[in-house]
Curated annotation (Swiss-Prot):
GO terms for cellular component: extracellular region. Keywords: Cell wall, Disulfide bond, Secreted, Signal, Virulence. Disulfide bonds join C497-C546, C507-C537, C508-C520, C547-C558. It comes from the Eukaryota. This is Class II hydrophobin FOXG_02748.
Length: 566
């Protein structure tokens, strides 16, 4: 609603009345000096603005609306000035204005209020002898900067975007029409407000799968479920190369793909580790709209704990579940559910399904090759008569299937493998038996054969062969095998906490509730394997943990190492 008020000073009215009655002989109309009036027009703005814009008022003033999207509810006072001419009627000769004398005021008015025709309002005298007042409202629009009434000029608002940081705020340019009746333009240039996602973070998860040993690792990328969660890069490596899920570290490098469109999915490529102890590299090419701030590529800085579980949701593909941190400084959790690894074609020993010769204690068997697993083979005998089979033993060292197959595939009486002849001198035998043992743990023992049989017993760190569980040792047979060099090397290179974030091995005490880890100390000696790590900490009444190096003012955050059950 719009309204206007005329503010006329009372002294001006008194001056006009005095001049109208001062000279009784004067009968002409008195034209006074033009009087300037001030118009106050309230302008109500009550609306929601989804984007920054400008509001052009009738008098040419522009109201800038910023910080959009926003709701604005306010009343502005549009102040304008105008001048008019005051006229008075003649005197009747007796010192008083004649009856029906009037003072006439001609004032401008907004056509939106009165229309396109003048409007006359008459106010009769309040007392006898006093003149009345006639107000003539003439429809007149306030002129703009070039003299053209702004109310008759239509404007078209055009909003464009400019580059940041050269444009830090809205810039308004008003183009007035060159002639009456033309359309003006209001050009509003705003900075590019497209929201750029934060640095794309990706968590790398390494898992064994059905990949041939000669093939490169297979990678798949799972985009983040929401902008604040990290994405996941799953690296599937051959089963024969994965001693554990976390033993092959991969470093994720995020870079901007110059050939990608903003709507394209990230592209991942994998560079395998250069050595057995080196780190691999996963390169994630992301679209320009989601590239990290700054130049170049950066390693993923996100603090996330990754837990891998085995499961299958039916589609045979890995799936992730992200749990956001409960505190601003705490790590988040990404649970990766991977399908169980399938049997690799190279994990079955040739000839393992062949039955043994006369006197054999069992048939050959094959074992699936999981992380750090080798194929288990049953023992076969020669022609020297009955012999006893030797139970298989486990060792953390890795035995290749090809070597094991070469030492056990021959079941003929006169055949013997090169491996059995090499290790014949390492193990005593009461009957001249030739025994091939690629690697055994220090705590395991194998019985010497009481016959002339050629026996091969490759190791299997985590999975027992069905044939080995069914075999029985001969009465009174016992041997002791010396620790192999590969076992000692594996123990010396054992890393209880291979994770780059949780890489600090600690022995921690449990709190009164039996949940949190408190008062952590370094192990008194270097662990040789997961069981040894657990035993070292258990000797002091503590639990084996892999912790994040604490920062000043931050609580200790730990995880249970792989293979530790406490």
């Amino acid at each position: 609603m719009k309204s206007k008020s005329i503010m006329a000073a009372s002294t001006v009215m008194e001056l006009a009345l005095a001049q109208a009655s001062a000279d009784p002989l004067c009968s002409t109309i008195i034209n006074l000096q033009p009087i300037e009036y001030q118009f106050q027009q309230p302008v109500l703005i009550d609306s929601y603005f989804p984007a920054n814009t400008d509001i052009v008022l009738d008098d040419g003033h522009v109201v800038h609306v910023t910080n959009a999207p926003t709701s604005l509810s306010t009343v502005l006072t549009d102040v304008s000035t105008s001048s008019t001419t005051l006229t008075s009627s003649a005197s009747n000769g007796n010192g008083n204005p004649p009856d029906g004398g009037y003072l006439t005021f001609t004032v401008p008015a907004n056509p939106d209020d009165i229309g396109n025709h003048p409007v006359t309002k008459t106010y009769p005298p309040t007392e006898p002898g006093q003149p009345g007042i006639v107000v003539i409202q003439v429809p007149t629009s306030p002129p703009g900067a070039d003299g053209i009434p702004t109310s008759s000029v239509p404007y078209v608002t055009v909003t464009t975007t400019g580059d940041f940081p050269s444009l830090t705020g809205p810039v308004t340019t008003t183009v007035t029409p060159g002639e009456p009746g033309a359309t003006g333009s209001v050009i509003i240039e705003v900075p590019n407000t497209k929201i750029t996602s934060p640095s794309a973070s990706y968590v790398t998860v390494t898992t064994p799968g059905s990949v041939a040993p000669t093939d490169a690792p297979r990678t798949s990328t799972i985009p983040p479920s929401n902008p604040t969660d990290p994405g996941t890069v799953i690296v599937v490596v051959p089963s024969s190369q994965a001693s554990s899920v976390s033993s092959i570290p991969f470093v994720t490098v995020t870079t901007t793909g110059s050939t990608l469109n903003p709507t394209d999915d990230p592209i991942t490529s994998t560079i395998s580790p250069s050595g057995s102890t080196g780190s691999g590299t996963v390169i994630v090419e992301v679209p320009p709209s989601s590239s990290p701030s700054g130049s170049g590529a950066s390693s993923s800085p996100v603090s996330v704990v990754t837990r891998t579980v085995t499961g299958d949701d039916g589609n045979g593909e890995p799936s992730t579940t992200t749990i956001t941190p409960t505190a601003s400084s705490g790590p988040g959790t990404v649970i990766v559910e991977v399908p169980p690894p399938t049997n690799s074609p190279s994990a079955t020993s040739p000839g393992s399904s062949r039955p043994g010769g006369p006197g054999s204690s069992g048939t050959g068997s094959s074992a699936s090759q999981g992380p750090s697993d080798s194929a288990a083979l049953s023992s076969s005998t020669g022609d020297a008569g009955p012999s006893s089979s030797v139970p298989e033993t486990s060792s953390p060292s890795r035995a290749t299937t090809d070597d094991a197959a070469s030492s056990t595939s021959a079941s003929a009486p006169a055949s013997s493998s090169a491996a059995s002849s090499i290790t014949q001198s390492e193990t005593p035998s009461s009957a001249g038996a030739e025994t091939s043992t690629p690697a055994t743990s220090p705590a395991s023992s194998s019985a010497p054969s009481t016959s002339d049989a050629d026996t091969s017993s490759p190791v299997n760190p985590t999975t027992s062969s069905p044939a080995s569980s069914a075999a029985t040792s001969a009465p009174g047979s016992s041997t002791e095998s010396a620790p192999s060099s590969s076992t000692s090397s594996a123990a010396a290179n054992f890393d209880p906490c291979p994770d780059s974030l949780y890489g600090n091995p600690q022995c921690c005490s449990v709190d009164v509730l039996g949940v949190a880890d408190v008062e952590c100390d370094s192990p008194t000696e270097s662990p040789t394997d997961a069981d040894n790590f657990q035993a070292i900490c258990a000797a002091s009444g503590q639990r084996a943990r892999c912790c994040v190096l604490p920062v000043l003012g931050q609580a200790l955050v730990c995880l249970t190492p792989v293979g530790v059950s406490n």
